[in-house]
Amino acid sequence: MYMDAFGWSAPAAPCQPSCGPGGDDDDDVLLAAVLGASFELHSLVDGGGNGAAGAVRSDDAYGLDVDLPSHQMSLLRCQDGLSALHGDASPTAAAAAFLDSVDVLPVPAIAGATHDDGGLLDRFAFPNVAETTTVQAAASNTAFSGYSSNTTGGGNISSGESNTYTEVASTPCAVSTTTTTTALPPSKRKLPEKYPVVGTSPTTKTTTTSETAAERRSTKRGAGGSSSITFGGGCHGAGAAAALLGYGRGYEPDTEAIAQVKEMIYRAAAMRPVTLGGPASASDPSSRPPPPPQRPRRKNVRISSDPQTVAARLRRERVSERLRVLQRLVPGGSKMDTATMLDEAASYLKFLKSQLEALETLGNGNGNGNLLHHGYYTGSRNATATAATGSSNSTVLAFGRDGLAGFVKSNRNLQL
């Protein structure tokens, strides 16, 4: 038999309903139906008090040789095959017929049954619910009966089929609902410690790919945006050279040495010939300065003929031309940007003015050979001293009469 093949031959515990409020007179009969390997009535207790006249033979309805009182006639019918049994049918045959189906039939209408007595079986008669509600059976017969009523032949029960049949049968005295909690499948995402965006708490917000990329870009900007390269704490010239030589941030440049170097550079620049495009340059083409580089004309560009636009363009061209001339006059101006070149031009101009004052003093015959009586250039913009002050706290670089003779007597054009 199917029960022995699956190892479910052990009988289930009988379900004994509790007694109602009717007392001992109403609870004369104790009905116990065992669902499993056997289907039999364990005991029937005759309350006595209604007499044999009120008893009806139950073998007409169930095939069991038992006398029931007349006020206990509302019985549940758990199997449609029991109605076809005869009076000599055994409980084993009834159990075999029960195993073929688990459908619930309505309560049979038995003649002489009364529902006003408040008997034990009246509260278990459900004339309307019996057609829609399945009766839950023992756990051992649930899976087999559900499987045998929906499949043909033997075979293994798969996990999908076993999870499908949630409606099971049981005795009418203890109708309960079994809730099965199915655990969630394991997540296929990466580990949270490697990818902190994926959290395990229910309040974790799933971020999109664009948000993650934006966070990464902002992190990179915050890490690399504060880096800067400084040479000598922002000093020009000597500070940058000191940083390149490895003196560090605490290096303090020697201002006197810097002034001396500038004096030497300005002296060499003042003694070189300067050509500004005079009439002599027309006869000597070699002394002509190289023409400015021609910019390629842009295609599909319309040049405006508006007077204001033309005037602004001409003004920009004149400024550019003057900057190019000044770049040739300032020592090292061709290797500087416009702002640095203008700064050096101011320093060079002060040096030239100091030299002019010294030459004018020597030309008037007032000089007695003492170089301290003449103004000199110290390398700084506002560090011009005179002999009256008698200050000698900076480097003095002056020229004597013999030293300046060749420069003064030359026919070079010193007009600026």
Curated annotation (Swiss-Prot):
One Gene Ontology cellular component annotation held by this UniProt entry: nucleus
SMART domains named in the record: HLH
Residue numbers spanned by region Disordered: 176-226, 276-311
Superkingdom as given in the UniProt entry: Eukaryota
GO biological process: regulation of DNA-templated transcription; regulation of long-day photoperiodism, flowering; regulation of short-day photoperiodism, flowering
Record's keyword terms, sorted: Activator, Nucleus, Transcription, Transcription regulation
Chain ranges passing through the membrane: none
Location of region: Basic motif: 303-316
Positions of the bHLH domain: 303-352
Xref: InterPro entries: bHLH_dom, HLH_DNA-bd_sf, IND-like
Region (Helix-loop-helix motif): 317-352
Biased composition (Low complexity): 176-186, 200-212
GO molecular function: DNA-binding transcription factor activity; protein dimerization activity
Subcellular location: Nucleus
One Pfam entry name: HLH
Family according to the record: Belongs to the bHLH protein family.
Subunit structure: Interacts with PIL13 and PIL15.
Role, per record: Transcription factor involved in the negative regulation of flowering. May be involved in the repression of the flowering factor GI and HD1 by interacting with PIL13 and PIL15 and competing with PRR1. Possesses transactivation activity in yeast.
Misc. comment: The gain-of-function mutant A654 (T-DNA tagging) exhibit late flowering phenotype under short day (SD) and long day (LD) conditions.
Stated name of the protein: Transcription factor LATE FLOWERING
Annotated source species: Oryza sativa subsp. japonica (Rice)
